[in-house]
Amino acid sequence: MKLSAVAGRYARAFLNIAIENEKEDEYLRFLDFVCNVYESNKDLFDNPVVKPEKKVTLIKSVLEEFGEEMDEFQERFLMLLFERKRQKLLRNIHELFEYEKILSEQKVPADLRIAHVPKEEELTLLRKFIRKYALKDPVFKTTVDESLIAGAVVEFEGFRLDTTVQGRLKRLSQETLKRGEMS
């Protein structure tokens, strides 16, 4: 997914409000909910005939059906997005908000691709490894990828650790090719 600079500005501004009100987790859940509502009704929310006020009111009513409320900052944030026709950036804003939230907590985001659902002892080892190099606690975004056969791939702060069978085979074939070229 391509992340835009505009989405970054919206995400940081919304996170600053969330931090000020000590509602970071609540605002993250709100963004996730709004993204899902928007993505399931894109035709309606992208329709220029429907006024921004109506779109925000609709999201507010859906939130209320799920027992949630929208505060004034969330409402103004959505109104701004719809007035400026930036609703297509909602998923990017959500992703960047989540990323910036992790950084604001003095943690490091880490992508974990693993062949199976990770066990707690595996996560503990990976946490220790990342703490050693990043000097921060990791927050994992885990993806199960059965094509990896076994092992895991962890990426954080520009580093990549690949312990998969697939990765080992790839490195082995590259080494073999290098040796073949040198002979």
UniProtKB/Swiss-Prot annotation:
GO terms for molecular function: proton-transporting ATP synthase activity, rotational mechanism. NCBIfam families: ATP_synt_delta (TIGR01145), PRK13441.1 (NF009976). Its main location: membrane. Belongs to the ATPase delta chain family. It comes from the Bacteria. Keywords: ATP synthesis, Cell inner membrane, Cell membrane, CF(1), Hydrogen ion transport, Ion transport, Membrane, Transport. F(1)F(0) ATP synthase produces ATP from ADP in the presence of a proton or sodium gradient. F-type ATPases consist of two structural domains, F(1) containing the extramembraneous catalytic core and F(0) containing the membrane proton channel, linked together by a central stalk and a peripheral stalk. During catalysis, ATP synthesis in the catalytic domain of F(1) is coupled via a rotary mechanism of the central stalk subunits to proton translocation. This protein is part of the stalk that links CF(0) to CF(1). It either transmits conformational changes from CF(0) to CF(1) or is implicated in proton conduction. This is ATP synthase subunit delta. It is a peripheral membrane protein. It is found in: Cell inner membrane. InterPro entries: ATP_synth_OSCP/delta_N_sf, ATPase_OSCP/dsu. F-type ATPases have 2 components, F(1) - the catalytic core - and F(0) - the membrane proton channel. F(1) has five subunits: alpha(3), beta(3), gamma(1), delta(1), epsilon(1). F(0) has three main subunits: a(1), b(2) and c(10-14). The alpha and beta chains form an alternating ring which encloses part of the gamma chain. F(1) is attached to F(0) by a central stalk formed by the gamma and epsilon chains, while a peripheral stalk is formed by the delta and b chains. One of its GO terms (cellular component) is proton-transporting ATP synthase complex.
